[in-house]
Regions:
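Conserved acidic segment of CheY-like receiver
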Residues: 2-13, 17-21
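Active-site beta3 strand of CheY-like receiver
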Residues: 46-52
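Acidic catalytic/metal-coordinating carboxylates
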Residues: 35-38, 61-64
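Conserved sequence signature across two-component system core domains
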Residues: 7-8, 33, 51
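Hydrophobic/aromatic residues positioned on beta-strands within the core alpha/beta folds
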Residues: 80-81
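Short hydrophobic/Thr-rich beta-strand motif most characteristic of the beta2 strand and flanking loop
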Residues: 26-34, 42
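Receiver (REC) domain active-site loop signature in two-component systems and cognate sites
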Residues: 57
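Alpha4 helix (beta4-alpha4-beta5 surface) of REC/receiver domains from two-component response regulators
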Residues: 64, 85-102, 106-114
Length: 124
C-alpha cells in the first residue's frame, strides 16, 4: 500500500482526492497539507511513499516545495497536479524533478498508476 501526502490549498479538492483513494486498496492518505511549507514539514515527519502536489498555493508554491522535498530525498515520488495543463506549464512542473504531472480534470487512479509506472510522465 502506498502512503500518500495530499497537498492542495483547496479543501474540496483534497476531499475529492481522499474519496478517490478510499475506493482502492493500493493507496492510503496519511496526511494533508494546505500549502508548500506545510507539505515540506509533513514530508519530513511522515515520509510518505507518494506526494500529490498542487502548484498554486499560498506561502510556498508546489514547484518550490517539490524542489525542497527532492533536495532532502532525491528518491521521493512527487506527482504534480494543477488546473492548468498548457505544455509550458507541464514542463515547468517536470523540471522540478517531479515524477509526473496530471491535470486535475484528468486525475484518476488509472492516470496515477500510469505515471507511477513510468508509462507516461504527463496525464493531461
Amino acid at each position: 500500500m502506498l502512503r500518500v501526502l495530499l497537498v492542495d490549498d483547496q479543501a474540496l479538492f483534497r476531499d475529492i482526492a481522499k474519496n478517490m483513494f478510499s475506493s482502492v486498496e493500493e493507496f492510503e492518505v496519511i496526511a494533508e497539507a494546505e500549502d508548500g511549507a506545510d507539505a515540506v514539514d509533513a514530508y519530513a515527519d511522515m515520509k510518505p511513499d507518494l506526494v500529490l502536489m498542487d502548484v498554486q498555493m499560498p506561502r510556498v508554491n508546489g514547484l518550490e516545495a517539490t524542489k525542497q522535498i527532492l533536495d532532502s530525498n532525491p528518491d521521493a515520488r512527487v506527482v504534480i497536479t494543477s488546473m492548468r495543463s498548457e505544455p509550458e506549464y507541464r514542463r515547468l512542473a517536470l523540471d522540478t524533478g517531479a515524477l509526473g504531472f496530471i491535470a486535475k480534470r484528468d486525475l484518476s487512479i488509472s492516470a496515477l498508476k500510469d505515471v507511477l509506472g513510468g508509462a507516461i510522465p504527463v496525464a493531461a
